[in-house]
Every structure is written in C-alpha cells, then in structure tokens.
Amino acid sequence: MKLLSKLARLAQKLVDNGLGGGLAQEMNKPVGERYVTPGMGEAVRAAASEGIVLLENDGVLPLARGARVAVFGRCQFDYFYVGYGSGGDVHPPYTVSPAAAFAAAEKEGRLTCNAALRKVYEEWRARSANRSDDGWWGHWPMHYPEMPVSPALAAEAAAESDVAVVIIGRAAGEDRDNKPEPGSYYLTRTERDLLDAVTAAFAKTVVVLDCGNIIDLAWVKGCKGRISALVYAWHGGMESGNALLSVLTGEISPCGKLTDTIAEQYTDYPAARHFGGKKYNEYAEDIYVGYRYFETFAPERVLYPFGYGLSYTNFSFEAGELVEEEAALCLRFAVQNTGERAGKEVAQLYVSAPRGRLGKPARVLAGFVKTDVLAPGQRREFELRVPLYSIASFDEAAGEYVLEAGEYAFYIGSSVRAQVCAGRWHVGRERSFGRLAHICPVQKPFTRLCMGEGGAPAQQTVSVRRVDLRARIEGAMPVAVGFRGERGITLQDVAAGRAGEDDFISQLSDADLEALTRGYGCMNAPFGSHGNGGAFGGITPALQARGVPPVITADGPSGLRVSAFTALLPCGTALASAWNPALVQALYEKAAEEMVHFGVDVLLAPGMNIHRDPLCGRNFEYYSEDPLLSGKIAAAAVRGIQSCGGAACIKHFACNNQETNRNKNDSRVSERALREIYLKGFEICIAESAPAALMTAYNKINGVWCHYNYDLAATVLRGEWGYTGLIMTDWWMQHGQSPEFAGVKDNAYRIRARVDLYMPGSFSRMCKGYKADKKLIGRVDRRGGVTRGELEYCARNTLRAVIRLCFAGNKAEQAEPKSAFRRV
C-alpha cells in the first residue's frame, strides 16, 4: 500500500506539473510563518466544544478531578481533524491531538493518564508498518488500522486506571464517498475486539467518535451496560483535543445536538436504496428526508433522534403564548435549568401541520434558539417568530406554496420528539403565497414515497412535465447597452460614482466582456496568495488598463486553502451541531480577518448541501439533513466571512449529494422535494445574509447540468429570490449543448443560462493562463451564439462583484483600489 501510495503521488505530481494548476493545490506545501490570527484559537476551540454531542452518559462524565484515565485508540495521536479535499486541505499552524490535550491536563493536575499504555501505543506507531499513510486525492484513508489490544493488555491498564477512553476515527471527503463496509461506515473487527477487551476489563468506558459524518452505531445496543458514555466529537479542527478535554472534564457542559437522525441500520435510511448510482439517483424518498421520514413512518427505527444531545444538567420548557401577526406567528416560551450544573440548552420549535391533500411530515423544524449559560435554577424567556411562508407546503399541481386548512400544532423541547405544546393555530381555508413558474421539470418518470390513507406510506409516480424553456428564455432576453467606443472611463470612476455602469460597459469590446465571464484559466493564478483557487475580473491587460483588478478566490469551509499556514476550523457538521449562529458568525469573523491578511477576496464557503444520505463523502463540509438549520448556520457563516469586506460563496447549488461520479450524475427529483428540501436552505441563507457569490454544483438536476440550468440561475435565484450576487460555476464544468438553441454550447450555453462566471476559466487542465474563447466572441449576435445583451448581463454581475470587493468606499469621491496584484 505504501509503495502504491508513493507511486500515485509521483504520478499526481507529474500530471499536475503538466496541468498548469489543475489539482496542483493538493501538492502545495505551506510556506512562511506559522501565522495565527489573534483570538482564532479561542474561537475554534469554543465552536468545536459547543458542537460536541453527548449521546450516552451513566454519570461517568464529567471526569472527576484526579481521575485515573487510560486512553485507547491510535486516533488519540492520529486524529482526523477534518475531512478530505478542497473543504479540508488546510495547513494549520498547529494542531492539538487528544493525546496532547490529555498530557496537558495531567500536567495541570486535572487527570492522571496511564503512561505505560501510552508508551505501548507510541512504540507500536513508531514501527514503519504501522505509520499512518495519508494516501492521495480521492484515495485517502477512511480509517487508520487500529492497534490490536489483547484482554491481557486491557486488564493491565485497568489495574492502574479507573476509566477507559476509547477514540475511534473516520474520514471521507471530496471524490471519496463513505462505503457501507468495515473501516468506513462500520467498525472493523479489530475495533470491535478493542471495545470487547476494554469493556470487559473496565467498569467505566467512554467512547469518543472522531468522525465528520454519521457512522453505524448499532453496536452500542449490544454494549448496553458496558459503555458508560458515548461522545460524538466530530472533526474539531486544530483545537480538537482541547475542545474534547473541555467537555470530558466538565470545563463546559456538553450542549451540542444532532443535526441528523441516527438510525438502527444503514438500510433504514430512506435514500439508501437510491444512493451511489453511477449515472443517476432517483430521490424516491421525496420530501421525507432524515427525521421527516423517521418521525412520520418509522420512529421505531431510530437510535438517536434529530436534535438529540445530553447535558451535564437538566432543563425544562414552559409554553407561553402564540400570537398571530400579519405574515408570521410569534411564539413565547421559557427555558429553566433544573439541574445542579450550569449549562446551555437548545430550544427547538417544531410544527405538526395538518396532513391535508398534499401529505406532510409528522414534524418539521420551525425555529430554534441557543440559550446563554444558565445557572442552576435560572429561567429565561424567549420569543421565536415563524414566518407563515416558512411552514407552507409546495403544491406541484398548482405551482404554489400553500397553507392547507386545519390545525397547526407547535412543540418546544430539546429534540424532534419535544413534548411541550407551545400553541395551536387554525387555518380556516387554504392560503396561497402566489403562483410560481414550474422549474427543472422531471424528464424521466420515477416512483416516490408519499402519504397514503390514514398516514401510511404509499408510492406515487412522478410524472414528466413539459416546460417551454426556449420561450421562457426568449421572453426575458437582456437588452444590450451596445459598444459605443472609448470614453476613458475606469472602473474606479464607476466605484466613485463619477460614471455609470452602462457608460463603462459601452466601452468594452465583445472580447473584454467575454473575459469578464471567465476566470484566469487555472488554479494558483499569478495574483494574490500562492496556492489560490483562481482569479477573475481583471485577468487581461486590457481590463487591468481600465482599472479592473483581479479578484482572488480560495477554498474553503474549514479555512483558507492556500500555500501558507492558516487556521483549520471545525467541520461543517461540528459547527451546525452547536446550533449557535452567533458562535459560527464569530468564528468566521476571525476567518475574515485571515482573508485580509493573506489577500483573499472570495472564500469558497460555506458548503450547505443537505445530508440526504450518511454515505456522502462531503457531509462533513455540510450541515444537516434539515434545510432550516442548514440555511441559518450558513447565513451566520456568510455574515462572518463578509464582515471585513470580503465575499462568501455559498455552494453547491444544488442537489450535490453524492461524490461518486459527481460530474456526470443526474439527481432526479420532484419539484416539491427540490423546493422544500434542496433549495430551501439556500433561499434562507440568501434572505438572511446576502452572500456576494454562489457556486453551482457539478451534477445534473433532471437531466440538466447545474452550470447550464436557466431555471436555477434565472427563474429561481434572480426571479423569485431577487438574488443580486455573482453566480459562478464549480471548478471545471462539463461540455454541453443546449437542447433548445442549436449551436449554443459550452460557455455560450452557460451564459444563456445566466450563470455569470466560469471557474477557473478553461476546459483544458493544461491551461496556464487566460485564452479568449474566439468561437464565442465570433458568434455574438449571430446564429449559434449569445447576444451582446446576454454577455453584458453576466459581465455586469462580475464587475459589480469586483467593485464590491476591490474598492474601498465604492461610492466615495475617491474610491481606492485594494492591492490585488501582489503575491503573499
């Protein structure tokens, strides 16, 4: 395996050297000082700590001061701090492993660690055959082979220690879906033997899961009475060890909550039979994703429900009043700490809507609030405002969101199984929120889950719908300003208000406009930080001469992915598990400071696709199976990222729920599921944070690639949601031919779909810089090409992004450009 890995790395290096960028960032090495943004370590630790979820505890936690602890599992040293790929390839200035954190706690006199056991692990890891191998792109290890622990070794450790802590790790990532096999979704035989040996020798065993996604926990039932505590620590970034110890020792009371349902078996998940397809996946579960399915049709198949998480204290909930406003409901309630320790709680509000003719999930998250630390006995009152539109259902036949007649019951509590009724609201007759255009029509019929008689599960055929997309596009063609010749206007003049956008655009040739709709061509563009994700805007001498600076991009959700030492943040699932938007915003405000330091204008984050199935490799980047929680946490991240003048780029729009064959895979989904589940989080995020940019997904939706999808970009984003930011592709899109317009293909097809910017800019990974698309330029306003108006439309959106990002005080009399030409 090690020889194969070395050969693969060599091949990767040779390929990347020839690709002039390509995936060369994977090979980047950090250079420069080990810079740490002031306050970043504390922010990472706080976020990672609050995201830790306590699933089981018989009283062993928090560990008593001076407790004698034996730590098992190689992940105490070889911790998975983050998942793989563009969302995790960060070079942190430091990392704190659990082993290091336990050692520090011992030095401070808080714990006594089993030194003999630690030495056994260190000697085993030092052997060449047992050293961790990090693999290569798309072939990273999902686990590290565990050290066998014999009953005798466990007994020796138990003779010196009172409590065992077993750490088990898993990882997946971009181009690397989890697999339903041992070493990935399931435990290995060695790990099972480890648990058997340790639980047989110790009366108290704490199991810690270092994972970015849900794994099989059916074994927990078989260990009932033998496992004292179960902790989901996730990938906590560079402060993982410190965050874990702060919870285990009671420095903070655990307050994380699950963002996904943990089922009895993998096959219990409704998408399991329709995940992993090489050509397509039918979203047969429809709107019944995650808890929407389990709480409606299979509550008995749940090990740990959505929103669940224990604390070291207890809380009670008290309903207040429900008040109807013009377009919302206002619900008041109280939370009280009824235990003996201080702690935080997440108050979760769920709505149970009338079944009606459309069928509804038993419960849907309608709102939530994270309390501050409540002292024992302390009581706090809260108010949640629920927009009526947010609890409406989409009627596919009518093409509108509706509130069906009947009673809407609201429940407040600490999980989806909340018991306290917070109020009931009655709708006398059905209410509509207005007709919408049908989008992304199904092209091949398939069978979906629906609600039958008496609320029982039933099947229904999703029929093909015909939409005249050509007429829709032709009826909304942008009007061109036209080329009027040189006027000596710079972009700085526009930014300062001395000239208008149209005045500037009228000077630009078709070639200039085309350059504004594409990136430089490769990753690691020769502007800004080394190892950047690419550049757009002022990428040609002609545009730079007109005062258009280049805009620098970088991944990603877990920190800046450049050739420098940058902070490694907790993974998306960990952040969402905190259920604390203010905390997430504060963390990304620190990331925004780091963007300024390293000259990055656009952070390609957050990733916010739905956790449709636990095997998706990039679930660690994303937040939840629920769109409301996903949208709220993403909005907090965006507000933080944009706090210092930079841009967030939310992604991947939409239905990018699988890594296997992601560039070719077709997500076949009903319009109701698309709108209620897979677009809803983006809608919430855009409404609450106005992200400056959005990235399309690699996959198709009902036969149309997202980067060529007019309905996603124009009908929904621009038309329905009023989005004014920049729409860009993911890196390297697929060749495509418009079925509606003969001869319109590739970049012309994308521009006609109103996707503003192609990144990194070239179809060829051999590209080492910008090269004009002469075919597109030569066909402007001609058969088989786009109109000048369409080209201006996309270029205008790019220019607006450049002004926003590269000019200080863009309406000031003297707008000053930021330095975007320097290398850091």
Annotate each predicted stretch with a short phrase.
Residues 399:
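Extracellular/periplasmic metallocenter environments
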Residues 419-423:
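Extracellular and select intracellular beta-sandwich modules with Ser/Thr-enriched
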Residues 424-434:
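Short beta-strand edge segments in extracellular beta-sheet folds
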